[in-house]
Curated annotation (Swiss-Prot):
Xref: Gene3D superfamilies: 2,3-Dihydroxybiphenyl 1,2-Dioxygenase, domain 1
Matches recorded under NCBIfam families: fosM_gen, PRK04101.1
Residue positions of the active site: E116 (proton donor/acceptor)
Name of this protein: Metallothiol transferase FosB
PROSITE patterns associated with the record: VOC
Matches recorded under InterPro entries: Fosfomycin_Res_Enzymes, Glyas_Bleomycin-R_OHBP_Dase, Glyas_Fos-R_dOase_dom, Metallothiol_Trafse_FosB, VOC
Enzyme class: transferase
Ranges for domain VOC: 5-120
The gene coding this protein: fosB
Gene Ontology MF annotations: magnesium ion binding; transferase activity, transferring alkyl or aryl (other than methyl) groups
Pfam family for this entry, one: Glyoxalase
Length: 144
């Protein structure tokens, strides 16, 4: 048995309509179906589901670095950054980043789920770490 890929992403949200608006405007997600407490989207081939659960505490998740990163092209970075600002999206302070690690912008949805738009690839990151992070052990040299 082997994993074929990611099947879908599901996020618990406090207000379904607010979140639908966010995912449509920020990610260009295409709304496929909406129920009383559920919405399904197609996000460029990714199945995204939202479940409204208004009574779940959401305060402490902001302390975690857990996030989902989406690839964007380097030439689209400034445009995407401007779009997030124009939509008044909560943009997070990014970490110090070496240019070899490419560009990233971190932000949250209305419920605090963290996302990143990143211009680099896994291979970019591995090459950079191989040069700079001498304490790391690399197991698969063919990965980059």
């Amino acid at each position: 048995m082997e994993i074929k890929g990611i099947n879908h992403l599901l996020f618990s949200v406090s207000h379904l309509d607010t979140s639908i608006d966010f995912y449509q405007k920020v990610f260009g997600a295409k709304l496929l179906v909406k129920g009383r407490t559920t919405a399904y989207f197609d996000m460029n081939g990714i199945w995204l589901a939202l479940n409204e659960e208004p009574d779940i505490p959401r305060n402490d998740i902001k302390l975690s670095y857990t996030h989902i990163a989406f690839t964007i092209e380097d030439h689209e970075f400034e445009e995407m950054s401007a779009k997030l600002k124009r939509l008044h999206v909560n943009i997070l302070p990014g970490r110090e980043r070496d240019e070899r690690d490419r560009k990233s912008i971190y932000f949250t949805d209305p419920d605090g789920h963290k996302f990143e738009f990143h211009t680099g690839t896994l291979q970019d990151r591995l090459r950079y770490y191989k040069q700079e992070k001498t304490h790391m052990h690399f197991y698969d040299e063919t990965a980059f």
